[in-house]
Amino acid sequence: MTLVDSITVSEAGGLTFLDIENDLASAKISLFGGHVLSYIPKSDNQERLWLSPHAYLNGERPIRGGIPVCWPWFGEDPSNLGRQAHGFARNLLWNVLDCQLHDDIAEITLGLESTATSKQWWPSEFRLRKKIVIGDQLDISLTTENRGEIPFSISKALHTYFLVGEISQTTVVGLDGVDYLDKTLDFSKHTQVGDITPFAETDRVYLESPAHVQIIDQSLSRKIDIEQSGADNIVVWNPWTRASLLNDMDADDYGHFICVETANALANSVIIAPGASHQMQVKYNVSSTASSP
């Protein structure tokens, strides 16, 4: 089924997908989790996102790779009620609210609303919207609206897995001098010195993060510019050898991705008043470094 020119619907493994193919890029989105699985600009026809070869694409578990939505909490259950990590948005079926095509750029809006199912995990009345713009760059916005009568607090992240050629030749630039909490060291506070080149398990929440950071991938001769707004944190994650403990990832997969996540996490959770909303947005643009000095 075709929704609009360049956007078609497909099904596999009991899941429904949107397949986007325009003159600027191709992409694939799972309605389960409202999850972007693939993004390939036509400028070089190279995949930008990493998706685990063992990802559950049947709705049984969250999908490993791509761009998961962590919402309405990021990380472990903040209330210690035994609820799953990273919230429930990545485990629910999202609705297609709108699809448009403007100047070869596809704009897709997905949505979730509070239901009896969501209230099993979280009692608040909400409306969640995710707008995905697919062209020569990838833009994503996540808007949370409080439809209830009392304020609520959320933390959230776009947990993006970027495909890299080799993690040891990958550097995150733009966080020098920024304080961070290191989960691998009991969330102790440190200050970033220089750029980040992971050489061991990395799990850091950067505080008061800048609006722009960059991933330099020397192995694939490209750089990824990340521009974010409405987000106070950047999370950098790579499991390193702990990948062997994850049943939806091969032991050596850590060498081929890095997560640089746009987030409002931990103490930077957002309180939304009744009738109010909050938007978090990120833009990803990839270019070649082949001619760089």
Model region roles, listed by residue range:
Residues 1-64, 211-212, 216-231, 274-292:
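Beta-strand-rich N-terminal accessory domains
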Residues 4, 83-134:
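Extended, loop-rich substrate-binding clefts of extracytoplasmic carbohydrate-active enzymes
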Residues 29, 142-148, 286:
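Asparagine-centered strand-capping/turn motif at beta-strand->loop junctions
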Residues 38-40, 150-156, 293:
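Short, hydrophobic/aromatic beta-strand segments
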Residues 48-91, 225-248:
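Hot-dog-fold acyl-thioester-processing enzymes
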Residues 58, 129-131, 268-272:
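Beta-strand-rich interaction surfaces with strong enrichment in secreted/lumenal proteins
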Residues 92, 197-274:
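Acidic/His-leaning functional-site neighborhoods
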Residues 150-153, 157, 161-233:
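Active-site/ligand-binding surface loops and adjacent short beta/alpha elements
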